[in-house]
Amino acid sequence: RWDPWCTISGYHGVTSVVLGNCGFGFAPVAKEFRERSMLTMTRTEAIPFDSMKEGMDWDWETIPEYLDSLDRIPKGVNVIQYMPTASLMTYVMGLEKAKAGEPASDSERKEMARLLHEGMDAGLCGFSIQRLGPDSVQADYDGSPMVTDIMCDDDILNLAEVLAERDDGFIQITQGTGDIRADIAFLEILAEAAQRPILHNVVAPARQDPEVHRRPLRWIDGCREKGLPIYAQCGTGRAGFAFTLEHWNLYDASPAWRAVTTGTKEEKIEKMRDPELRQALMAEAEEADRRLQVIQAGVGGNPKSLVVQGVNRQADLQEFVGKSVGDIAEAEGKHHIEVMLDLSLRGDLNVEFLGPDKGSNAEFMAEMMNE
């Protein structure tokens, strides 16, 4: 809506996109929940709130109305849409109950199934989920888990049964609760229940160890041999993440980082100056790094390895460009977390960091794509 050309996709030669990944979207959305849903997108995807507010005319509430609206506007790419499960749950259950992690009632499950049927009749391709547990690496605007992060198995299987009944559609799921055996077991249960393709996020290569991507691919091969239609979505990006602390949430597996990076820009600045919160970040640094390694979606990596890429066009910070946070910390005799926070504050949270390029092994990428 704020970019009908889907510019970033087009820049990379993508001509068709699927909207609503990871369970979040803008329909169905009650009128009084519109602004809250935009705040969620601001937090999770760094889309400026003002851009959304100006670019979205909100001439819909339901999925059929949204798809009709999407059909009317000019677009630069082809699009299809998932049912965003977080939006569906909030619409039916209310935010408070959905956020509490309570299972849906029988009547709520029936209504969610009805709305999924209705949406697929109107053109949806299936439904999507992000389930990353209470310490989700990608939290909501207020720092709480996304609705689907703490969604129970039975509520997901209720939607899977809709696809099985229709023999139509597919499921995109990012499942990473920290218990890999339980996660794998649930994906197999989900595939058995739906009997429709499951798009598993994400298989990503390391630079040197091929077992990092071969292990999950062997599991997927085994699933296919059992008749379970599970497919891997593979990460083949050739660069690390570039980000500023004004818009960054992929350290959310760390409660200390989550506390500091939620709220308005002014609130974030105040928190980053707070001695107690800074100390909590430093004290939790090793634990945060461990969690980010366990939860694969923690793509930012260890803050020590981040490289300063942009400094808000400030001449007084230019000397830091091209240096790693760890090297700056060693030179200044400071903790690397202090360096990251201090540079960000000096640059009005617009200092840009570049994460490590963890997957640029062309041989491994080709192996995944040709599997």
Model segments located where?
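Divalent-metal coordination cores built from histidine and acidic residues
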Residues: 2-127
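Conserved active-site and cofactor/substrate-binding residues in soluble primary-metabolism enzymes
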Residues: 4, 57-61, 65, 74, ...
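Structural motif
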Residues: 15-17, 77-81, 125-126, 169-170, ...
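Short, basic, helix/turn surface patches
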Residues: 37-56, 155-162, 229, 259-262
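Hydrophobic alpha-helical scaffolding
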Residues: 52-56, 102-106, 145-150, 173-180, ...
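Structural signal for hydrophobic packing residues in well-ordered secondary-structure cores
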Residues: 67-74, 116, 120, 160-167, ...
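Functional cores that coordinate and move charged inorganic groups
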Residues: 96-103, 116-120, 124-255
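Hard-cation-handling environments
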Residues: 223-227, 231-363, 367, 371
